[in-house]
Amino acid sequence: MDVRLRADEYATTRAILKSAFDMWLDIIDVDVAIVGGGPSGLTAARYIAKEGYKVVVLERHLAFGGGTWGGGMGFPYIVVEEPADEILREVGVKLEKVEGEDGLYTADSVEVPAKLAVGAIDAGAKVLTGIVVEDLVLRENRVAGVVINSYAIEKAGLHIDPITITAKYVVDATGHDASVVTTLSRKNPELGLEVPGEKSMWAEKGENALLRNTREVYPGLFVCGMAANAVYAGHRMGAIFGGMYISGKKCAEMIVEKLKNNE
């Protein structure tokens, strides 16, 4: 194969910078900012974006997917139960029925986050990696956006001021640490918010508590996924992920309803 590739350093640099600046100018004001690109965050992003709203997902690591990639103790499979399996089927994930267990399936732990991310992006959400949310924007007793910085800057310990993304709603989908709600609680003790953390593993109880705990914790701030159980002291579940996906979908539905009602 005789191919000659055009490679120009100036053109490459200019193209990257122009695309990046155009992108940032487009997303500094959004309908929903989702902090955390794990299973619940990506699920919420897809359902909200499908309704035509502007959504950005902010993930501190260079890879989205949260704890899904490693499956259970490094074995590359996760478990999902009905009816959450339908959420994965919508993005084309291949599921294998667990023999002798009604309504239980396994899924490839690499395929799942990849297809969830593609589903969110194809629906119109913007997924950014390497971005850390270090604080929240508050306006008149309401969360009104996120304060962001480069994760590389944070890791290097450099004293560099952040920038902001304004949003009608913010979602804490940061997993076990519930870092967004924790930050709001720590910086604003007068709000009376507490984050007791999750309880020890009890999969069935944790899965069902997760759905109850997915809610608006403060005006403009929702919590979903494992962050919800951390905020409201639910049990952890391990490598069964159905509750995470349903939590993300429930969070999306609640936010979409508020957006449609201009709340």
From Swiss-Prot:
Residues where Fe cation binds: D161, H176
* Known pathway: Cofactor biosynthesis; thiamine diphosphate biosynthesis
- Keyword Transmembrane helix listed: no
Q: What is its EC number?
A: 2.4.2.59
**Keyword annotations of the record:** Iron, Metal-binding, NAD, Thiamine biosynthesis, Transferase
| Annotated catalysed reactions | hydrogen sulfide + glycine + NAD(+) = ADP-5-ethyl-4-methylthiazole-2-carboxylate + nicotinamide + 3 H2O + H(+)
Q: What is the lineage of its organism?
A: Archaea, Methanobacteriati, Methanobacteriota, Methanomada group, Methanococci
Entry's Gene Ontology BP terms: thiamine biosynthetic process; thiamine diphosphate biosynthetic process; thiazole biosynthetic process
Q: How does it assemble?
A: Homooctamer; tetramer of dimers.
Q: Which SUPFAM superfamilies match?
A: FAD/NAD(P)-binding domain
What role is this protein assigned?
Involved in the biosynthesis of the thiazole moiety of thiamine. Catalyzes the conversion of NAD and glycine to adenosine diphosphate 5-(2-hydroxyethyl)-4-methylthiazole-2-carboxylate (ADT), an adenylated thiazole intermediate, using free sulfide as a source of sulfur.
Which InterPro entries does the record associate with it?
A: FAD/NAD-bd_sf, Thi4_fam, Thi4_prok
Q: Molecular function terms in GO for this entry? A: iron ion binding; pentosyltransferase activity
This chain belongs to the protein called: Thiamine thiazole synthase
* Cofactor(s), by name: Fe(2+)
Entry note: cofactor: Binds 1 Fe(2+) ion per subunit.
HAMAP family in UniProt: Thi4
Q: Where does NAD(+) bind?
A: S40, E59, R60, G67, V133, H159, I160, D161, S179, M226
- What family does this belong to? Belongs to the THI4 family.
| Annotated positions binding glycine | R236
Task: Indicate the enzyme's highest-level EC class.
Answer: transferase
